[in-house]
UniProtKB/Swiss-Prot annotation:
Family label: Belongs to the RRG7 family.
Protein name according to UniProt: Required for respiratory growth protein 7, mitochondrial
Subcellular location: Mitochondrion
Gene for this chain: RRG7
Main localization category: mitochondrion
Entry GO terms, CC: mitochondrion
Statement: the UniProt record of this protein carries the keyword Cell membrane: no
Transmembrane segments: none
Organism encoding this protein: Candida glabrata (strain ATCC 2001 / BCRC 20586 / JCM 3761 / NBRC 0622 / NRRL Y-65 / CBS 138) (Yeast)
Domain of life: Eukaryota
Length: 253
């Protein structure tokens, strides 16, 4: 039985309404609504909304541009609120730390939760590098390799490279070849399937039932890194819906 309580969501600023951002963008850009630039920006805003509301990633910094290195959004992600929420809901138990590291694809992976100060509710934040791919076709190995290459170039001087995670967002699924590649990567990788916004009966965008997080995939290294963090349970039981009322007037990190 899941307890519907998420006392962990600790807030620091005013809540950001991405639906308002989306509506303002649409109203201000009607003349270019058929362009690739418009569609790309609209999907980027949709992704920001889902990262913020569903994964509790705050302080999203849009960096996309000519010299973005393939990254559209950067942010810091603190998973402790998700961990505490999963504890409150009774879907995980407080781990007996430290959890053992595991060698995956020739990489020693030590769970992030080992770095948590559970008593004082302190945990390190992860840097995330987000790429938005509003494609109409499935994501090929080429796209996966490009983001992996960007990750490697940006973390080359960072010995603790697991503290940075690339996230690819697309309305499409990866191809079977892409899935095989993700299994073999020796870096953490999160794939989010977020569909595009669709028009409703009055030709307005349907913000409630479209543009939603439809699923996710963690590769083996990321699964090992987030072992015991409560993230899989947060996603499986959609605990972000239980916590949604707690986030309507405040922001979180």
């Amino acid at each position: 039985m899941i307890r519907h309580s998420c006392r962990a969501l600790r807030f620091v600023r005013s809540f950001h309404d991405y639906n308002s951002d989306i509506l303002k963008f649409v109203a201000s850009n009607t003349l270019i609504s058929d362009s690739a630039v418009y569609k790309g920006k609209l999907y980027e805003l949709t992704v920001q909304r889902e990262l913020y509301n569903k994964l509790r990633i705050g302080q999203l910094d849009v960096v996309g541009g000519a010299h973005d290195g393939g990254v559209d959004i950067k942010a810091l992600w603190n998973l402790f609120p998700i961990f505490q929420c999963a504890l409150d809901a009774g879907v995980i138990k407080e781990p007996s730390l430290p959890l053992k590291g595991t060698r995956i694809n020739d990489t020693l992976v030590k769970p992030l939760v080992n770095q948590y100060d559970i008593k004082n509710k302190i945990a390190p934040s992860i840097e995330v590098l987000v790429q938005c791919k509003a494609y109409v076709s499935k994501i090929s190995p080429k796209e996966i390799r490009e983001l992996a290459g960007t990750y490697l170039s940006l973390t080359a001087k960072n010995k603790a490279s697991l503290s940075t995670i690339p996230i690819m967002c697309s309305p499409q699924l990866p191809t079977s070849s892409s899935l095989k590649l993700l299994e073999k990567l020796n870096i953490p990788f999160l794939y989010l399937r977020i569909n595009t916004l669709r028009h409703g009966s009055l030709n307005d965008f349907e913000l409630t039932n479209t543009g939603q997080l439809m699923g996710y995939l963690m590769n083996p290294i990321l699964k090992g890194y987030l072992e015991g963090s409560g993230f899989e349970e947060w996603m499986k039981f959609e605990l972000y819906n239980n916590a949604m009322n707690h986030s309507q007037d405040k922001d979180f990190i």
